[in-house]
Amino acid sequence: MLHFVWLSSIMSVMITLLILIYWFMMLSQLHNIITRRRAPSLHQKIFAHSKQVTPYLSGSFGALHSKSIAITNDDSHKEIKRVYDGLAQSHPEAGKAYWLTRTWDLVCWQPIYVTFISIYGLHSLPDIKNIGQFRYKEFVTGYRFFNGDHQHGSPEELIPQAGEAILALTEFYRSQISEWTRIRPGFTNHLLADLLLGSLIKLQQHEPSLTNDYITEQAKLWLEACQLPENHLNSLKIDADSGMLKLIRISCCLVYKCDSRKYCDDCPRHPDNKKTAQ
């Protein structure tokens, strides 16, 4: 009888905790809805273009809440740590190196994608430095701007300013992660270079009229703006089939360490890419 009462008590506590977690998540989503404001015209276009790239890149306009991953929130490291912990729970077999690499890529992908969409799609640049991001379980999806600041210009005019914003953001993310683990600048710089060059490859795939020379020149501008070595250009190769550029990354995302996963097509460890690199 006592054993039954003890089990009932434990179950009651667990159910209460689950209900509290559910309502906490609902309140966070409700805050986003309540504080959402009508976005300026440019931002509406950015949001529309973003969703065409992927539904996970969902933008909004309004106040940021305390759970946002943003340069204005010194407690961002708590949400980033929850991303890391979620990855560790979902993929315990992959190990710490994968969890950290994946966490870094997750906090960086949206600012980079939004920057590229804005510059190459709309010849504009919103206030990327102050972008807010949201965590959903072990994923970072959804972003928000709380002001309508923006600039217009050609890619050549906007890339230096975008580089400054990206450098400020990535340094902030690194400092936040440093609150709970060691993360080297050299490690994050390689990942950033791969993300930038990979975005340019996607740009050419989306717009095949952009020549290899143009993409290479743009790559030089991005590397310079983000204070990354120009030798990263060696990662760009000519695809034998399409004649377009392809990327062989410097860094490995380590996803192959997850159960039932393989090397990515652009992985430096992939046998085909080892032949190309020689």
Name these PLM-found stretches.
Residues 6-12:
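Low-acidity, Ser/Thr- and Arg-rich intrinsically disordered low-complexity segments
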